[in-house]
Amino acid sequence: MGFGDLKSPAGLKVLNEFLADKSYIEGYVPSQADVAVFDALSGAPPADLFHALRWYNHIKSYEKQKSSLPGVKKPLGNYGPVNIEDTTGSTAKDTKEEDDDDDIDLFGSDDEEENEESKRVREERLAQYEAKKSKKPALIAKSSILLDVKPWDDETDMAKLEECVRSIQMEGLVWGASKLVPVGYGIKKLQIQCVVEDDKVGTDVLEENITAFEDFVQSMDVAAFNKI
């Protein structure tokens, strides 16, 4: 598995094709899989690779929360198309904390002569290490929610209904993948994923805002609710 060399145009093209029908590298919410691939990139993909660029900008919005995203960060060879090998040449570390800690050599090389200069360097590194540890963000409680949004009848414009739902923007709310699911008599419901920060967005708030589009929405139900 892999994307080839993610620092090359060919590797970015593979990533773009992989994300053509996906919101995330794995599953329906941002995870350490997204962090592993994001960290392997040299920068934002070019504008013509719009699937990869959309994903890149979305994951970039989690910059301060990367270490708290669910899952375990694995080597790049664990992600991507099964018929392509990873050749990026960098191994993903288990966590953002390890990334930060590995940047700092606390004690220097074994053969470094113990003198005033080496003591000063070591003290500076210890100070940097402590500063980075103190700046790590507090864990934010989040939940992944799958919503069922039902229209009035089979004549309801479902594209407009989804547009209305996604127009709801608030701090602590991120919309994810969606699909239309048949319920009978030609009627389809909108099934849409979202991730919320528990202390900022509740299901009651979502229901109030979604059912406010009463010309399109008959009702809203929570199909699945999982803590992240």
UniProtKB/Swiss-Prot annotation:
Q: Where is this region: Disordered?
A: 70-122
**Acidic residues bias (residue ranges):** 97-116
Specify the superkingdom: Eukaryota
UniProt keyword list: Elongation factor, Phosphoprotein, Protein biosynthesis
Gene Ontology cellular-component terms for this entry are: eukaryotic translation elongation factor 1 complex
User: Does the keyword Protein biosynthesis feature in the UniProt annotation?
Assistant: yes
The residue ranges of the GST C-terminal domain are 2-90
Residue positions, PTM Phosphoserine: 109
Q: Name one Pfam family in it.
A: EF-1_beta_acid
Q: Which GO terms describe its molecular function?
A: translation elongation factor activity
Record keywords: Nucleotide-binding included?
Answer: no
> How is the polypeptide modified once translated?
Phosphorylation affects the GDP/GTP exchange rate.
Question: What family does this chain come from, according to its entry?
Answer: Belongs to the EF-1-beta/EF-1-delta family.
Subunit structure as annotated in this protein's UniProt entry:
EF-1 is composed of 4 subunits: alpha, beta (alpha subunit of the eEF1B subcomplex), delta (beta subunit of the eEF1B subcomplex), and gamma (gamma subunit of the eEF1B subcomplex). Interacts with elongation factor EEF1A1.
Enumerate the PANTHER family for this protein. EF-HAND AND COILED-COIL DOMAIN-CONTAINING FAMILY MEMBER (PTHR11595), ELONGATION FACTOR 1-BETA (PTHR11595:SF21)
Function in brief: Catalytic subunit of the guanine nucleotide exchange factor (GEF) (eEF1B subcomplex) of the eukaryotic elongation factor 1 complex (eEF1). Stimulates the exchange of GDP for GTP on elongation factor 1A (eEF1A), probably by displacing GDP from the nucleotide binding pocket in eEF1A.
The protein, known as: Elongation factor 1-beta
Q: What lineage is this protein's organism placed in?
A: Eukaryota, Metazoa, Chordata, Craniata, Vertebrata
Q: What would be the name of the gene that encodes this protein?
A: eef1b
